[in-house]
A protein has these predicted regions:
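FAD-binding subdomain of flavoenzyme oxidoreductases
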Residues: 117-271, 472, 488-493, 499-505
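Activity-critical C-terminal alpha-helical subdomain
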Residues: 196, 445-505
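Alpha-helix capping/hinge segments and adjacent helical runs
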Residues: 37, 427-439, 463-478
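Conserved, mostly hydrophobic/aromatic
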Residues: 81, 221, 467
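A glycine- and small-aliphatic-rich helix-loop capping segment at beta-alpha/alpha-beta transitions
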Residues: 98-116, 144-148, 171-182, 229-235, ...
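C-terminal substrate-recognition/cap domain of FAD-linked oxidoreductases
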Residues: 41-51, 231-235, 241-418, 425, ...
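N-terminal flexible segment immediately upstream of the FAD-binding catalytic core
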Residues: 1-79, 96-126, 155, 275-286, ...
Length: 505
C-alpha cells in the first residue's frame, strides 16, 4: 500500500519568516514574467483579502496571489508552480463555507475571477458554456430571454461561481427535484497540475470511457483546475407556488418531510427552519413567517397550472395529517419570492444576532430529521451555545448555524466541539459529514469518523493519479492517518479512545 500523499514541502508550522521570504521571492521571480504586473500580488496589504473564504474562523495569508487573464497564463503559472513544487489553491468568489479555498502559507492562490464570461447560450440544445468565474445567478440571467434557467441555486448564487459549484458539487433549495451540480453539468475543461489541458465529459448527453466527470465534480480543487463548464438549462415552469406550513413542534415538521416524500410527492423545493431561525430572518426581511411556530416548512410546486393546483392540494393534505397548524399559500409570483426571501437570507440574518456563526453541513436520512433536531437541542445545553437550524429538508441536508463570539477562544473551542458532535451524530444516524459545502479543512477530522483507513487510502489513490506530488489544494478533504490518530486523542469518552487500532504519534 502506498503511503498517503505527504508533499515534501516546507511545513507552515516550522517555516521561519526568513525562509518564507526567500521562498516568496523565488516564486514571485518565477511568475512575474508569466502574468501582467497587476495580476501578481504578494504584499500583505494586497493579499489579505484572500486570507480566508466564507469560513472566516480560519485564516492564512497566501504566499502569492496570481490573477491570470488568459488560459495560456493559467497553464504557465501551473507549470512554474509544478516545477518549483509550490502548492496551488484555486479560488473562485471565496464564498465556500468549509475552508476549501483557505490559502497555503507557502503556496499560490490562483484566482479565477477574470474568467467571468459566458461563452454561449444554446437554446436548442438547452446548454450554456461558461467560464469558471461566472456567477451562478448570471447563467440564469443570460438564459432567461430564451425561457430557460440553470437549476442548482445555492443561497450564495448571486456571488458564488460555477467553478466553485463544480468543486463543491453544490445543490440549493431546488435540488430535490432538479438535482445537484453533478446532475446539471455535461462537461468540464481545464488544466492538470502540470499545466496540461484536460477535458471531462462532453457536450453530448453521454461521453465515452470512464465517468471521470463525476469524480472531478465535488473534488474540491484537488484533481484539476476548472476553467470552463458546459451546463444543462431547463425550461422555466409555467407556474410556481409556495406553501408556508407552520408546526407547533419541530419533530412534527421533520415527520412531515418524510411523509411528503413517502406519499410520492417530489416538491420543487422543500426547506425547513426552526423558531430561532424564523425569528432572525423575519426581523431581517419581513417575509411573512409565523413567529409563533416552532418550525416552518417552505414547500414549492411548479409545472402547469393544473399540475400545481393538484399538487398543492396533496401537499396541504399530507402536512395537515402530519400536524401542520397553519398554511399560507402564495397568491402570485411576488409573494412566492417573498416567502423564499427569508430562507435565502438565513445566513446574513444570523450575522445580525451573533458576532460570528459556524454553518455546519451534514446529511441524514429524511426519516431521522426529527431525531437530529432533538439531539441538536440537547447539544445546545451541553455546549452552552445557541443554534439556529435551517435545512434542505427534502434531501436531508442540514445547515445548523452555531452562534458564538470568535473573540472568545473558549466559545470558539466549544463551537468546534459542537460542530464535530453534530457531524458524528449525523454519521451515527446513517448520514454523512458533508452535503454540499465540502470537507475543506473544517471537516477533516470528522472524515476520520466516517471513513476507514482503507477507504481513505483509496481516496489518496485517486488523488495521486491526478496529482502525484500532492500540490493541488494540499491538506484538504482527506485526513492522513496521523490526523485521525490525533483526532482520536482529542475525543476520549469514558476512558475509551476511538480508533484504538490506530497508532498514536
Amino acid at each position: 500500500m502506498n503511503a498517503p500523499i505527504e508533499p515534501t514541502l516546507l511545513q507552515p508550522a516550522t517555516t521561519t519568516r526568513e525562509a518564507r521570504a526567500r521562498r516568496q521571492a523565488e516564486v514571485v521571480a518565477a511568475l512575474a514574467p508569466l502574468v501582467p504586473a497587476h495580476a501578481l500580488l504578494w504584499q500583505p496589504e494586497d493579499t489579505v483579502p484572500y486570507d480566508c473564504d466564507g469560513l472566516t474562523a480560519y485564516r492564512q495569508m497566501p504566499l502569492v496571489v496570481a490573477l491570470p487573464e488568459t488560459e495560456a497564463q493559467v497553464a504557465a503559472v501551473l507549470k512554474a508552480c509544478h516545477r518549483l513544487a509550490v502548492p496551488v489553491v484555486a479560488r473562485g468568489a471565496g464564498t465556500g463555507l468549509s475552508g476549501g479555498a483557505l490559502p497555503h502559507e507557502l503556496g499560490v492562490t490562483l484566482s479565477l475571477a477574470k474568467f467571468n464570461h459566458i461563452v454561449k447560450i444554446d437554446p436548442v440544445s438547452r446548454t450554456a458554456v461558461v467560464q469558471a468565474g461566472v456567477r451562478n445567478a448570471a447563467i440564469s440571467e443570460a438564459a432567461s430571454p430564451h425561457g430557460l434557467y440553470y437549476a442548482p441555486d445555492p443561497s450564495s448564487k448571486i456571488a458564488c461561481t460555477i467553478g466553485g459549484n463544480v468543486a463543491e458539487n453544490s445543490g440549493g433549495m431546488h435540488c430535490l427535484k432538479y438535482g445537484l451540480t453533478v446532475h446539471n453539468v455535461l462537461r468540464v475543461r481545464g488544466f492538470t497540475v502540470e499545466g496540461e489541458p484536460v477535458e471531462f465529459g462532453s457536450e453530448a448527453l453521454d461521453a465515452p470511457g470512464l465517468d471521470l466527470l463525476s469524480a472531478v465534480i465535488g473534488s474540491e480543487g484537488m484533481l484539476a483546475v476548472t476553467l470552463e463548464v458546459t451546463v444543462k438549462l431547463v425550461p422555466k415552469p409555467q407556474l410556481a407556488r409556495a406553501i408556508l406550513a407552520s408546526f407547533d413542534d419541530v419533530q412534527k415538521a421533520g415527520h412531515a418531510v418524510a411523509a411528503l416524500i413517502g406519499a410520492g410527492i417530489i416538491p420543487a423545493g422543500l426547506e425547513m427552519m426552526d423558531k430561532p431561525m424564523t425569528a432572525a430572518v423575519e426581523d431581517f426581511v419581513r417575509a411573512g413567517y409565523d413567529l409563533e411556530a416552532a418550525a416552518i416548512l417552505i414547500c414549492e410546486s411548479d409545472g402547469t397550472p393544473e399540475e400545481v393546483e393538484e399538487e398543492i392540494g396533496r401537499m396541504v393534505a399530507v402536512m395537515e395529517q402530519a400536524g401542520a397548524t397553519r398554511f399560507s399559500i402564495s397568491r402570485d409570483e411576488a409573494e412566492r419570492l417573498k416567502f423564499w426571501s427569508g430562507r435565502m437570507n438565513a445566513f446574513p440574518a444570523s450575522g445580525r444576532i451573533s458576532p460570528d456563526y459556524m454553518c455546519m453541513d451534514s446529511t441524514i436520512p429524511r426519516k431521522k430529521l426529527a431525531e437530529i433536531l432533538m439531539r441538536i437541542g440537547e447539544m445546545e445545553i451541553k455546549y452552552g451555545l445557541r443554534c439556529c437550524n435551517v435545512f434542505h429538508a427534502g434531501d436531508g441536508n442540514l445547515h445548523p448555524l452555531i452562534l458564538f463570539d470568535a473573540n472568545d477562544p473558549d466559545q470558539l473551542h466549544r463551537c468546534e466541539l459542537f460542530g464535530a458532535d453534530i457531524l458524528e451524530t449525523s454519521v451515527m444516524l446513517g448520514g454523512t459529514v458533508t452535503g454540499e459545502h465540502g470537507v475543506g479543512v473544517e471537516k477533516l477530522s470528522s472524515m476520520c469518523v466516517q471513513f476507514t483507513p482503507a477507504e481513505r487510502e483509496q481516496m489518496f489513490g485517486l488523488k495521486r493519479a491526478f496529482d502525484p506530488r500532492g500540490l493541488l489544494n494540499p491538506g484538504k478533504v482527506i485526513p492522513t492517518l496521523s490526523r485521525c490518530a490525533e483526532y482520536g486523542k482529542m475525543h476520549v469518552k469514558k476512558g475509551l479512545l476511538p480508533f484504538a487500532h490506530l497508532p498514536r504519534f
